[in-house]
Swiss-Prot record:
Record's subcellular location: Secreted
Cystine connections: none
Protein name per Swiss-Prot or TrEMBL: Gastrin/cholecystokinin-like peptide
Organism name: Trachemys scripta (Red-eared slider turtle)
Function: May control digestion processes.
Source superkingdom: Eukaryota
Biological process terms in GO annotation: digestion
Lineage of the organism: Eukaryota, Metazoa, Chordata, Craniata, Vertebrata
Keyword field: Digestion, Hormone, Secreted
Length: 52
């Protein structure tokens, strides 16, 4: 297993930086918008959903 071969310092670096790298890549590709993700759920529009 690749993760078992890593040192503790390498695992900590990965845990610290991978989320930032994924977010940056997603922003470049237009798959994820930070401002939209931070809005409260009740502000999102879900067409076809019924309000009770």
């Amino acid at each position: 297993d690749l993760l078992e071969a890593l040192s503790q310092d390498q695992k900590l670096l990965m845990a610290k930086f991978l989320p930032h790298i994924y977010a940056e890549l997603a922003n470049r590709e237009g798959n994820w918008h930070e401002d939209a993700a931070l809005r409260p759920l009740h502000d999102h529009d879900y067409p076809g959903w019924m309000d009770f």
